[in-house]
Regions:
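PRPP-associated nucleotide enzymes
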Residues: 1-292
Length: 292
């Protein structure tokens, strides 16, 4: 934590990523407050002065080095940094989307939150309109938001997307495109320095960038924790089943952690058939491999 300039970090949520960003903001606020209180206690003990005086001196230093004239709030109390960046999202009648950033972000380390799989109604036009967006709508909303951030002078842009769009199009058959790689390169060319995503469909996508860094996080601990509250993970009949070959490595981790056997489904598909939803599958045959 930088005590002289605690507001360099900025979080900007696209309409699809608002709920996710709210949880991160709450966690950030808690972390910063705990670190501040710990810093105050250590400094007070070291210099044998009161915590109130340390708090006042830290606030004074923050005011001196802040780009603002002065940081709002009581100088004798902890002043929480303001991470949230406000923006106005406009949906036009012809389907175009516009992002207008309402706060200064010049020189900030900006994190843009977007959940392209969000199917809940998203608010536009100052909350007057609500619309359910497709993946393509969310992607376009992300692009115009990135552009607005660049035009507003953000120093660094990190894109936080729990679901990486078009990640299943990471390999091609015949004359198909490699859309997963191309979309990532579009983000890179726009000026995004880093993408943070969760359990990306294929790690091959990480190799399609020149300078952009893709961080593929895993929710393994959280999954096991929730699973332990639902079933008996110590059951001797428990087997970890990988739904396809692409998920084998991920399921190997769960099998080894839970010390359970691993099985796998091998699927054969009819690629001449285009599926519309989960009930309309192009899978022609499935084989269960493993001792269950």
């Amino acid at each position: 934590m930088n005590y002289s300039d605690p507001t360099k970090l900025g979080l900007l949520a696209c309409p699809g990523g608002e709920r996710f960003a709210e949880q991160v903001l709450k966690r950030l606020s808690t972390i910063y407050r705990h670190r501040f209180e710990r810093k105050v206690q250590v400094m007070a003990d070291r210099y044998h002065i009161s915590k109130e005086l340390v708090t006042r001196k830290i606030n004074f230093a923050n005011d001196v080095y802040s780009s603002m004239l002065c940081i709002p709030g009581n100088v004798n109390e902890y002043r929480a940094p303001r991470f949230k960046v406000n923006a106005r999202f406009t949906w036009f009648a012809n389907g175009e989307i516009k992002t207008e950033i309402l706060d200064s972000i010049r020189g900030k380390d900006l994190y843009i939150f977007q959940d392209v799989e969000n199917r809940q109604p998203c608010r536009f036009n100052d909350g007057r309109d609500e619309r359910e967006l497709s993946v393509n709508d969310h992607v376009m909303n992300t692009l115009v938001t990135i552009d607005a951030a660049i035009q507003a002078g953000a120093e660094r842009i990190t894109l936080v997307m729990p679901a990486y769009p078009y990640s299943r199009q990471h390999k091609k058959k015949g004359r198909e495109g490699l859309t997963a790689a191309r979309l990532g390169q579009i983000f890179e060319n726009y000026g995004v320095q880093r993408i943070i995503t969760l359990d990306i469909h294929s790690r091959e996508i990480e190799n399609c960038f020149n300078k952009l860094r893709l961080e593929n996080l895993h929710a393994s601990y959280q999954v096991i924790e929730k699973l332990a509250g639902i079933i008996d993970v110590g059951d001797e009949n428990l087997v970890v089943l990988s739904p396809d070959t692409g998920a084998v490595d991920r399921n190997k981790f769960y099998a080894s952690t839970l010390q359970k056997p691993l099985a796998m489904l091998y699927k054969e598909r009819d690629y001449s058939k285009v599926t519309k939803d989960a009930t309309d599958s192009n899978i022609t045959e499935m084989k269960l491999l493993g001792d269950i």
